[in-house]
Amino acid sequence: MKHSIDSLQKEIESFAITSNETLEEFKLTYLVRKGSIANLFKQLKDVSPDERRAVGQLLNTLKTTAEKKYEDAKDTLASSAASEKNNIIDLTLPGRTHFLGSEHPVQKVLGDMKQIFTAMGFAIETGPELECGVYNFDKLNFPPDHPARDMQDTFFIKLDEKDGNDVLLRTHTSPVQIRVMLDQRPPIRVICPGKVYRNEAISSRSYCVFHQLEGLYIDKNVSFADLKATIYSFAKQMFGQDVQLRFRPSFFPFTEPSAEVDVTCYLCNGKGCKVCKQSGWLEILGCGMVHPNVLCQCGIDPEEYSGYAFGMGVDRTALLRYKIDDIRLLFENDIRMLDQFMQ
């Protein structure tokens, strides 16, 4: 009897279950009421009483082993069938359209700005967003008590108090111009795009972080007329040939004389509305002739060289071009808004 059990044990262990057909064959051969294991249980009555207990335990172990092999094989085949079903490609199903991203309106405008100015001969320069006060204020002719140096206007970074230098998030890209003038000799013709930071209340017209593009031209005999020609050429290419410009006297510590430039309102075409505060004009940039003190700070002789500088908000220009009435929409990443710029 023990020999028959050992023989059947080896037979069960060597039985290969590779399909549902062989699984059913295994069940019919060993596990049904008239199977091989059941037949051995029927022969248990012929075993001597002394051996019956031990033989019964062997038969129970054999039956448990066979049942476990059957269940494991059944689970494996079911899992394999499910996996194959998931991998089947139904060519009759409709295809899935891939989502196509689009260029952000600010990046579109910035790209156009770069293209316009590089066509005029300007090179592109960049600099760090984390700046020191020397480049952000001192060398730009900001007086020590200027409001822009206060914490309510600027994000200052607290480092080692022993350092003694002001470290801040730059409030404009003008520090890049300073670095260029310190590193290069005239003639200099560059634009400086990048992100800047202001400690301002967030509203439909202002944000605490925005994109700016500044320009600088230093050479002999540069005049305000050259500045106006550059601004006019840029505005016509950016906003269309019919756009009207207005130069207003202004003040900036780093330029003298200084001006602010307005264009006709994109919503009312100069008739007056709530966006332009009934004036018919919208400011796009500030500009002026580089102050002699700034040139001296950078080792450039103001008696020999002169130059102009200008700066504009890329985000505000995007609002003008695409007739968007809230700057916050440019930073919210709302797909419903961004989808409108998909090409």
Curated annotation (Swiss-Prot):
Binds 2 magnesium ions per tetramer. Keywords: Aminoacyl-tRNA synthetase, ATP-binding, Cytoplasm, Ligase, Magnesium, Metal-binding, Nucleotide-binding, Protein biosynthesis. Its EC number is 6.1.1.20. The keyword Cell division does not apply. GO terms for cellular component: cytoplasm. One of its GO terms (molecular function) is ATP binding. It is an enzyme of class 6 (ligase). Its cofactor is Mg(2+). Belongs to the class-II aminoacyl-tRNA synthetase family. Phe-tRNA synthetase alpha subunit type 1 subfamily. This is Phenylalanine--tRNA ligase alpha subunit. It comes from Prosthecochloris aestuarii (strain DSM 271 / SK 413). The gene is pheS.
